[in-house]
Amino acid sequence: MPRVVGVARAKELILTGRVLAADEAERIGLVSSVVPAGEARAAADEIATEIAARGPVAVREAKRLVDLASDVDLATGLAAELDASDRVFATDDMLEGAEAFFAKREPQYRGR
């Protein structure tokens, strides 16, 4: 929590036990979005569908890099991004994505 909202705000929330309203949690970056009651599953499914439409190798690498970024210095993070780019650009999915873009069609990623 301190990395997301800062040390002072994290201490305030944790030590007071204050409950945040959804809009405040979104405003301070504690949650990425707020949806109306009863619509959380549909909103999550929509995000999952968007992610699933992307190249699985690229998604996996992006997820790994985001997780890594909070634990390493800038130089290490940039080196990891360069290595990941090399891996992603060497995939069949990268070629499929480029071909689909120029053909103005949806890509058919295979995770290779």
Residue ranges: model-predicted function:
Residues M1-L30, D45-I51:
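Conserved catalytic cores of soluble enzyme domains
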Residues L13-G17, A62-L65, F101:
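Short alpha-helical scaffolding segments that buttress acidic/His motifs in well-ordered protein cores
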Residues A22, V31-A79, D86-R87, D92, ...:
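C-terminal long alpha-helix characteristic of the crotonase
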Residues E99-R112:
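Terminal low-complexity tails and localization/encapsulation signals of metabolic enzymes
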Residues D93-M94, A100:
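Interdomain hinge/lid region at the active-site interface
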Residues R9, E61, E81-A84, G97:
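Hydrophobic alpha-helical segments typical of transmembrane helices
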